Amino acid sequence: MSSKKRQAKLYQFDPMIYPRFLWVVTGGDYIDIKKWFLTYDGEEIEESDVSNLGGLTISVTFRQTQSLGILIWFPDIRLAKANWITHESTHGTLELFEQLGLRVDYRNQESVAYLAGWFAECIEFVKTGKVNALKLEKKTDESNN
């Protein structure tokens, strides 16, 4: 893997049936994450929370709109294979269910599987260039999906 930092790009998705967003960030580093997001509780994200990771999934607040949701960050999306996308999608699903106080167990596995698949599909859209990154020069309140 090259040590050169890749330009950060931000993608936003709206799951429609859940009152939260999914943000996928590719490239960049802590400074980019901090510029766009706060913790879910509105605090600053600590550098130790996002440093030296191959990927990250956390509950966040989007600074620009104060919207709540899930951030999945891939410093280099080219390295994201099916197992890694599945891994982060599972974390994202569990984070979102936790945010909304929804139960996760064998009795509601269909909703868990559906949401994890949706997360993975969004990441795949980013990886394959099927969606455009947000342009943050203007206020953005619409999703790319």
Language-model features: where?
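Catalytic Zn2+-binding segment of zinc metalloproteases
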Residues: 89-105
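Short acidic DE-rich linear segments
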Residues: 134-145
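Active-site scaffold of zinc-dependent metalloenzymes
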Residues: 38-79, 92-96
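Non-catalytic terminal regions of proteins
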Residues: 1-54
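Compositionally biased regions
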Residues: 3-4, 60, 144
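Post-HExxH zinc-binding segment in Zn-dependent metallohydrolases
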Residues: 104-134
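Short, surface-exposed coil-to-beta transition loops
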Residues: 79-80, 107
